[in-house]
């Protein structure tokens, strides 16, 4: 297999299975950092790796490591933090995969990460002093917000309980993810807001598609009625207005 084929296959895997890929990336990076911490000793390699990937609430830090606005969302330094984030990510990402194209999970994850990073720098630099932030919480909140805004009536199957409304699951997940304060809270709110905007934009586009489809069905029904009248009673039975309508509608369908 050529390098080009390997790259193409990898890109297709990333697009077709974003939920699994995000989980694998987060776990792999956590394991890699733990290995650096254990093996690196006092060499400082662990600290350098962390400093290069987490976000600082300062624009100077962002300019030094611009990629950190996205990479910090894949970095967890605590196992419990990783576990909670990935459990809620899997829960809400599965909802998105059920109601929208799977590739949206990637866009939501990265959008939430960037929104959280910007909130961290904007709010944290003013009120909380210099801090660093790592973890997928803002990205998960973005996916949570999008799922709730787009499919509020969705129901999730929970073992031993049955179907649970998404609103209830979101409430529980929100409480778990909103336990932080300060900079982290600002990042979570920013991620949630970004997700809600995504979800509402999806609903708006869906309503537009439904309206266009409904209007097309009405036009088609009227066109068929005029054609039936012309076949049954003859073209001469159509009024001048009906002939113009039939001509316009027929030309419209040909253009479509």
Where are these regions (language model features)?
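A detector for small-residue-rich transmembrane helices and their helix-helix packing motifs
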Residues: 1-227, 233
